[in-house]
Amino acid sequence: MQSFWLIFQLLICLALGFVLARRLPKWLERLSFQILPYFTYILLIAIAIEFSTTLHSIAEPWQILNHAALLAVMTSIGAFVCCYVLFKLLGYQPSHGKVSMSLVSKSLINISYAFIALALGYGLAELSSGFGYTLHISTWNLLLVFMFLIGLDLAYSPLDRSWLNWQILLVPLGCILGSIIGAFVTGYFVPSIQLKDLIMLSQGYGFYSMTGIVVTELKNAHLGSIALMNDLFREIFAIVFMYIIGWRYPRSAISSAGATAMDVTLPMVKQACGNDFIPHAMVSGFILSVLAPIVVSVLAAL
């Protein structure tokens, strides 16, 4: 029952943000949108503080990185291949395009900020522990605020009804199915983690600031750490895929980008794939951003 109460809180905050958009005072809306880009880093600092105690209790903490990296590789490739097969069956042909190294560098620098935030949080936790004081920040309450801000942001996303055709919906479908297939493959190499937990971890779609906290609350801190690192790695792989093969297989690259397609990797979609594929990225990113907290929470509660 507690699990469903936590899921309900997430959905209520997301829905409140969506419904209250354009109804809040203008100054408060402006403040919310100014805070949103930096709120992720605040969350990551808080997550690192919370997970620092977990790392001390784990005999081989490098296993977290190994398992997360393997799962991220398999789910990213799974999403790419699954989307490719779906569109290949419809007779779609590869595209042509290009991407600049400057855009790739800028995207990777933005990803590095996330790792810096994690390192800062871990450093603060270790420093305070050295002075005999234990830092504690409620990551769950921060996540609820973040979900409200995400709801506001989604309400202002420029989605056009003409974009909602069944071909575009195959992009997020490919991500969902491919991620599940990737979890099955990972299960063969990582028998120490139950298959149902790997499937749950695979459904974060790169939404790292949410999955780590939700999985920690509903399962345990060990799986929460894997969830966080898995989705961080997925975001990195999304950028790499978009650069290497996004210009040739845009729909598949967008699918592997998961929830990041409507924010972090969107500039690369625009340049590498062209404006024709912006609707694919926006619709897929929107759907997966909404589904991620719901699916992960439900699977974690089972």
Pin down the residues of each PLM region:
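Entry/N-cap segments of selected transmembrane alpha helices
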Residues: S3-L14, S57-C82, N110, A114, ...
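Hydrophobic transmembrane alpha-helices of secondary-active transporters
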Residues: C13-A21, L36-P61, L120-A125, T139-S162, ...
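Transmembrane alpha-helices that form the ion-translocation and gating core
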Residues: F18-R22, K26, H67-G97, L170-V215, ...
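Alpha-helical membrane segments and immediately flanking helix-loop junctions
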Residues: A48, T53, D197-F237, Y249-V283
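Juxtamembrane boundary at the C-terminal end of a transmembrane helix
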Residues: P293-L302
